[in-house]
């Protein structure tokens, strides 16, 4: 299931890059992220109800049925995109993709830059807080659900207020804002209801940051290699998410959750500085 979802996502983002360029591409990325955020929040709410009322098997059957509906819808869509024709073998295509990235350093820099969004995959932090801090105030499942829902709502509405002000020249300020918002959340985590507000602020800039850095990569990549570059980018992005989760798990046994959160926020300051160093090449 996860392999299929990953393959679909890479194909989808490659297709968007072939259909659109520049600002329209960034807006398409934002719309995609908004839809994802809505379904993420809505899915959590529905899945909890289904699992509690009908069991796990029913949830899996419904999940598979949703994929079937999506397949029926996509079959009927006619995308006006010229199919790539190649006689190279798959391993040669993979090798050529890595050679292309190696010979175009800016692509490598942008892949690394986009990975900063993976730092916001701090679901483990929310779970730890719910089990250790919030269980005295509210049930653990409800604490996790409300925390994720608060961030998901912000992910949906953030681009409406922020994206029109973000440009290539001031993107680093958005990264700094993301860092400060995460640090703010770290300071107010002990109060569940205030932390919901802080999580909302954290989510406001994440969607725009994700879509803008993704658009930078898509716009700077040759169409011939866009599919492979997007796939490698997703691999690196997932690595960033995994490393963030491992970091949280390791540090949770060494220090407090608020310190971990603050360290994650500081990482965005480092990425903001890094972006200012590579901006002249973009």
Spans of model-derived segments:
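Cytoplasmic helix-loop-helix junction between adjacent transmembrane helices
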Residues: 1-38
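Hydrophobic transmembrane alpha-helices of Major Facilitator Superfamily
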Residues: 3-11, 119-124, 191-192, 204-212
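Helix-loop junctions on the cytosolic side of multi-pass membrane transporters
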Residues: 14, 18, 56, 60-89, ...
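Hydrophobic alpha-helical segments of secondary membrane carriers
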Residues: 31-39, 113, 232-236
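A single, central transmembrane helix in multi-pass transporters
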Residues: 54-61, 99-159
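Juxtamembrane intracellular "pre-TM" segments in multi-pass secondary transporters
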Residues: 79-111
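C-terminal transmembrane bundle of multi-pass solute transporters/carriers
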Residues: 132-282
């Amino acid at each position: 299931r996860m392999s299929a979802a990953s393959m679909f996502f890479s194909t989808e983002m490659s297709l968007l890059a072939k259909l659109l360029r520049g600002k329209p591409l960034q807006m398409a990325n934002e719309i995609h992220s908004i839809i994802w955020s809505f379904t993420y929040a809505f899915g959590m709410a529905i899945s909890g109800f289904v699992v509690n009322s009908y069991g796990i098997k029913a949830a899996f059957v419904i999940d598979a049925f949703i994929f079937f509906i999506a397949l029926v819808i996509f079959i009927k869509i006619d995308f006006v995109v010229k199919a790539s024709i190649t006689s190279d073998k798959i391993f040669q295509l993979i090798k050529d993709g890595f050679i292309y990235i190696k010979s175009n350093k800016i692509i490598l820099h942008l892949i690394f830059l986009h990975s900063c969004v993976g730092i916001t995959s701090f679901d483990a932090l929310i779970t730890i807080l719910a089990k250790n801090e919030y269980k005295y105030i509210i049930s653990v499942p409800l604490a996790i659900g409300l925390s994720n829902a608060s961030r998901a709502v912000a992910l949906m509405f953030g681009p409406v207020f922020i994206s029109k002000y973000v440009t290539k020249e001031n993107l680093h300020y958005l990264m700094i804002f993301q860092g400060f918002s995460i640090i703010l959340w770290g300071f107010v985590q002990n109060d569940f209801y205030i932390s919901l507000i802080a999580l909302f602020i954290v989510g406001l800039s994440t969607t725009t940051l994700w879509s803008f850095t993704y658009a930078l990569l898509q716009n700077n990549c040759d169409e011939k290699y866009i599919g492979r570059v997007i796939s490698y980018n997703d691999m690196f992005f997932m690595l960033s998410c995994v490393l963030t989760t491992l970091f949280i798990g390791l540090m949770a046994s060494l220090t407090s959750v608020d310190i971990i959160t603050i360290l994650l926020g500081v990482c965005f300051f480092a990425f903001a500085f890094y972006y200012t160093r590579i901006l002249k090449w973009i």
